[in-house]
């Protein structure tokens, strides 16, 4: 079991520190770390770790870890912080609805972070590839919503 735990840790570290876009690339990286495994084993490991693919800064789709097990990336910002600082485009309001425009591939993870925060202003979100629709609570003001969102998306102001 120790071998598997070490392998899972290695997978998390590789995904957190490098842009890996395919299982083949990940198998090569693991091989360089001394792990010998099949594509089927790697596939099961990725499923167990709940690894997904998301657009990177250059538009390439790469493996990412869920937020709760994300290791600190090399550099000053975590992947989540980089995403929030660079993916946001605009925020507009209409009645009890707000719309956030993002770069392609960013909306889903931003909506996930919004939905996982306790909010007195937002009931929920619906996300596409580059757009998030927010349903606002009765009486929520644009100022209050913008303040709440600034806790998640720092460059929203």
Swiss-Prot record:
Protein name: Arginine repressor
Keywords, alphabetical: Amino-acid biosynthesis, Arginine biosynthesis, Cytoplasm, DNA-binding, Repressor, Transcription, Transcription regulation
One GO CC term on file: cytoplasm
Record bears the keyword Transcription regulation: yes
Keyword Transcription regulation: yes
One Pfam family linked to the record: Arg_repressor_C
Pathway where this protein functions: Amino-acid biosynthesis; L-arginine biosynthesis [regulation]
Function field: Regulates arginine biosynthesis genes.
Family, per entry: Belongs to the ArgR family.
Location of this chain's protein in the cell: Cytoplasm
InterPro entries: Arg_repress (IPR001669), Arg_repress_C (IPR020899), Arg_repress_C_sf (IPR036251), Arg_repress_DNA-bd (IPR020900), WH-like_DNA-bd_sf (IPR036388), WH_DNA-bd_sf (IPR036390)
The organism's taxonomic lineage, starting at the top: Bacteria, Pseudomonadati, Bacteroidota, Bacteroidia, Bacteroidales
Gene Ontology molecular function: arginine binding; DNA binding; DNA-binding transcription factor activity
GO biological process, alphabetically ordered: L-arginine biosynthetic process; protein complex oligomerization; regulation of arginine biosynthetic process
């Amino acid at each position: 079991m120790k071998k598997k735990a070490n392998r899972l840790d290695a997978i998390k570290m590789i995904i957190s520190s490098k842009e890996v876009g395919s299982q083949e690339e990940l198998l090569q990286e693991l091989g360089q770390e001394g792990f010998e495994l099949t594509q089927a084993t790697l596939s099961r490991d990725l499923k167990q770790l709940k690894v997904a693919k998301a657009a990177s800064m250059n538009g390439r789709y790469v493996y990412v870890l869920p937020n709760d097990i994300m290791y600190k990336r090399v550099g000053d910002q975590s992947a989540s912080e980089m995403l929030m600082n660079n993916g946001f485009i605009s925020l507009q309001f209409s009645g009890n609805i707000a719309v956030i425009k993002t770069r392609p591939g960013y909306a889903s993870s931003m909506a996930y972070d919004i939905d996982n925060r306790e909010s007195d202003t937002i009931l929920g979100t619906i996300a596409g590839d580059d757009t998030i629709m927010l349903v606002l609570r009765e009486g929520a003001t644009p100022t209050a919503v913008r303040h709440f969102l600034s806790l998640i998306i720092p460059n929203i102001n």
